[in-house]
Amino acid sequence: MGLPWYRVHTVVLNDPGRLLSVHIMHTALVAGWAGSMALYELAVFDPSDPVLDPMWRQGMFVIPFMTRLGITNSWGGWSITGGTITNPGIWSYEGVAGAHILFSGLCFLAAIWHWVYWDLEIFSDERTGKPSLDLPKIFGIHLFLSGLGCFGFGAFHVTGLYGPGIWVSDPYGLTGRVQAVNPAWGVEGFDPFVPGGIASHHIAAGTLGILAGLFHLSVRPPQRLYKGLRMGNIETVLSSSIAAVFFAAFVVAGTMWYGSATTPIELFGPTRYQWDQGYFQQEIYRRVSTGLAENQSLSEAWSKIPEKLAFYDYIGNNPAKGGLFRAGSMDNGDGIAVGWLGHPVFRDKEGRELFVRRMPTFFETFPVVLVDGDGIVRADVPFRRAESKYSVEQVGVTVEFYGGELNGVSYSDPATVKKYARRAQLGEIFELDRATLKSDGVFRSSPRGWFTFGHASFALLFFFGHIWHGARTLFRDVFAGIDPDLDTQVEFGAFQKLGDPTTKRV
């Protein structure tokens, strides 16, 4: 046929059997990728330290999605929450991966069958004998079935009525686990961070889908609407389907980047806004203040801070710190976290407590500045020592650690104090192993960043695809130069001007 690469899909334009076949093959490819990717990730995933080396630090992409839907155990004998298990059951990580690969193989065979047996009676219009699809009826069927699936997911899977529930955690990502969720029917259901909204919205949307599907199955569209929206043209289906997909992609890019109950930080890592707003830092200070109010010493109060909470308060876990072309996991960047050194408290020679000003998200380097409780600069690491007035040496800054591995250790040596001041710019201080993975010390993004970038990019691309195919189907007659409502018999090539009998060729 000699079609250019960008027109090859016209081969299925008027061929319903093979149109179905290529869509089944597409499903086979997607399911096959998902299953294969899951097996690859399971082969390289290290489940030994869920606190300091969680899945998102290791660059896992499909494991978090399985986990949020209720999968936590592996046939390898480990659980995502730590510890060992003896009977993971069929719906383990490997079981889900295997099910996808099996489904992919069945879809592959079905696609081949439908490619060979394309001329089925079901696709033939009994009036004309030509291949035809009743698109409004197919729309109703798909709407009904997707509504049924949506309702079932919300009413059974999420609620735990028949299923495991979903991953639910506290606001600081410390106590996450899979549990049943009750639907939230009040105004709180519209809070994107309330898990109950996931159940209630799926139940509501599913009910609407079922009713809308039944409506479209029982009511035919008016003729003027049918013609006006080109409901008989398969490219209309393509255009509106692309619209649904790009809209969904934009929505999930937002829920992933800004955070929501559907994207827990234990599975996808923290958001950049939690660093920008000092979200974890405030909670840590609140807990320490509570401890001090209960007559605990500074050392005791800081020692009770969970290592998991301290680790979130580290700039290396900020997804916006990774560069666009820095491939690999976070562990390949700043290394594998080994342990929390503790919280450094800086003081000048007058005994004032000093706080290191933290590095903003979009800086690669930042001056080391220490301020007191009133925000007044008291010390720094100067660029020009000759002009310095606030250098660590001049001010006599010391550092003492509370909690962590260096609990109770203090330093007054200026070089050591400056070293820890520089590291305190990046949040809580952790020992990082860069040797194991030959990590290069350059920050990487988390799967949260990759997912957002990918979905926002494809959403934009698909938006233009929707405009393109929508315009093609709405203005098909204009582009073709033929009026679709032309009733008179036109013999192509009989007239010099198409359809004008006064210009008959001799």
Swiss-Prot record:
UniProt cross-references to PANTHER family, sorted A to Z: PHOTOSYSTEM II CP43 REACTION CENTER PROTEIN, PHOTOSYSTEM II CP47 REACTION CENTER PROTEIN
GO molecular function, one term: electron transporter, transferring electrons within the cyclic electron transport pathway of photosynthesis activity
Pfam families in alphabetical order: PSII
SUPFAM superfamilies on file: Photosystem II antenna protein-like
Assembly and interaction partners: PSII is composed of 1 copy each of membrane proteins PsbA, PsbB, PsbC, PsbD, PsbE, PsbF, PsbH, PsbI, PsbJ, PsbK, PsbL, PsbM, PsbT, PsbX, PsbY, PsbZ, Psb30/Ycf12, at least 3 peripheral proteins of the oxygen-evolving complex and a large number of cofactors. It forms dimeric complexes.
Transmembrane intervals: 21-36, 101-115, 140-156, 203-218, 237-252, 457-472
Protein name as annotated: Photosystem II CP47 reaction center protein
A GO CC term assigned to this protein in UniProt: chloroplast thylakoid membrane
Membrane topology according to the record: Multi-pass membrane protein
Task of the protein: One of the components of the core complex of photosystem II (PSII). It binds chlorophyll and helps catalyze the primary light-induced photochemical processes of PSII. PSII is a light-driven water:plastoquinone oxidoreductase, using light energy to abstract electrons from H(2)O, generating O(2) and a proton gradient subsequently used for ATP formation.
Family: Belongs to the PsbB/PsbC family. PsbB subfamily.
Entry's localization field: Plastid, Chloroplast thylakoid membrane
Keywords, ordered alphabetically: Chlorophyll, Chloroplast, Chromophore, Membrane, Photosynthesis, Photosystem II, Plastid, Thylakoid, Transmembrane, Transmembrane helix
Signal peptide: none
Organism of origin: Cucumis sativus
Taxonomic lineage from the root: Eukaryota, Viridiplantae, Streptophyta, Embryophyta, Tracheophyta
This protein's record includes keyword Ubl conjugation: no
